[in-house]
């Protein structure tokens, strides 16, 4: 429920920004460039290691405190260690 409210507010905010830009008389070429720059926020980052339940081939593929579980399909699972 909270997530859907936040998504709705984000969409309304973007719509407000786009309509206010049109009212100020900016040309249509500005809006697509602005939207392309905003794409970076929503793209996932490339990571060096795999998170919990991510696919793996060996233990070094997984993040710290995770080990590769070799059941089919292979996935990264907690190796029962703690620390920083």
From Swiss-Prot:
Disulfide pattern: 49-63, 56-68, 62-76
Principal subcellular localization: secreted
Localization per record: Secreted
GO annotations of cellular component type: extracellular region
MF (Gene Ontology): ion channel inhibitor activity; toxin activity
Taxonomy, superkingdom: Eukaryota
Propeptide: 22-47
Tissue: Expressed by the venom gland.
Keywords: Disulfide bond, Ion channel impairing toxin, Knottin, Secreted, Signal, Toxin
Pfam name, any one: Toxin_12
Family: Belongs to the neurotoxin 10 (Hwtx-1) family. 05 (F4a) subfamily.
Its biological purpose: Probable ion channel inhibitor.
Name of the protein this chain belongs to: U21-theraphotoxin-Cg1c
